[in-house]
Swiss-Prot record:
Ubl conjugation keyword on record: no
Pathway entry: Carbohydrate metabolism; tricarboxylic acid cycle; succinate from succinyl-CoA (ligase route): step 1/1
NCBIfam families xref list: PRK00696.1, sucCoAbeta
Reaction equation(s) it catalyzes: succinate + ATP + CoA = succinyl-CoA + ADP + phosphate; GTP + succinate + CoA = succinyl-CoA + GDP + phosphate
Species of origin: Mycolicibacterium smegmatis (strain ATCC 700084 / mc(2)155)
Identification of the protein by name: Succinate--CoA ligase [ADP-forming] subunit beta
Cofactor note: Binds 1 Mg(2+) ion per subunit.
The ATP-grasp domain, residue ranges: 9-236
Domain of life: Bacteria
Pfam family, one: ATP-grasp_2
Keywords associated with the record: ATP-binding, Ligase, Magnesium, Metal-binding, Nucleotide-binding, Tricarboxylic acid cycle
Amino acid sequence: MDLFEYQAKELFAKHNVPTSPGRVTDSAEDAKTIAEEIGRPVMVKAQVKTGGRGKAGGVKYAATPDDAFTHANNILGLDIKGHVVKKLLVAEASDIAEEYYISFLLDRANRTYLAMCSVEGGMEIEEVAATKPERLAKVPVDAVKGVDLAFARSIAEQGHLPAEVLDAAAVTIQKLWEVFVKEDATLVEVNPLVRTPDDQILALDGKVTLDENAGFRQPGHAEFEDRDATDPLELKAKENDLNYVKLDGQVGIIGNGAGLVMSTLDVVAYAGENHGGVKPANFLDIGGGASAAVMAAGLDVILGDSQVKSVFVNVFGGITACDAVANGIVQALQILGDEANKPLVVRLDGNNVEEGRRILAEANHPLVIQAETMDAGADKAAELANK
């Protein structure tokens, strides 16, 4: 989960990373009030989860509260790379002597953590990597040893930060590592990390990505969820503990196990080539549970997608036997009632398959069509979606 800058700075404050004081708002009038409270020039910054805010006119210097009002009025509603600005961060403008770059991230290729540090802050780090690679330090971090002050100082030194700021920078770098580890982040980035004329080190910007898989031990992170930006179907699936990703096709997919669901997407896409080019509408993995409640929740999410014209339920019975899945489907259709209004192609195989098929046959629901194989089921679902 990507955070807005103001949310990243909330985590920074929690771990004593120094930042410039400010507040978030969604109104120009409030932006003026915040500027008056700060009593110094401020920066008015669009809160969007994308880069290039400055170039798009989303970051402005305001010398007076009236300037803050004017800039806020202009920035709110601005479209920045498809992201509409709904919130602003009004923060005290800082005097800047130098700008640096620091980040911690997962290095998936080398299966380790990585610190990146550069004296060339305030610009796109990709540009630094391309034009001045020698100015960008990439330092592997041992997950067990972590980052103490000495190692943090070494990271700053390798990033070519001036000798006179190494000690102060090391303190902030260690605290950013604390944010990375204790908040279960996959990215913590500060660009720029600045030195002020009086040699303070401040995180003027902040970019944090949290690992949603760690949500069970980070309940407080739920408050960072941007419900306005989250697809409502994905939000509903998440509330029901379903692994769901919306796609742009017409055939709804329900399966048990990520591997089987991925294979089902491929088979449906292939079958769709013979039926008007229809495609899978989603990824939905119900995992090991196929109870009536789980199946009803899954169908409710999929049928809420207006693009879906048919649904393909593809289940291989293992620990969860096919008869339990079949009972779940029958009961789910009873729970949903008239809301279940799209044809349902069901392919069962594996443990207790004959009993599962018998249960579906006896139920004789008008929407349910059984298929013997995955290929046959995919073909039928694609055919129905193309009608």
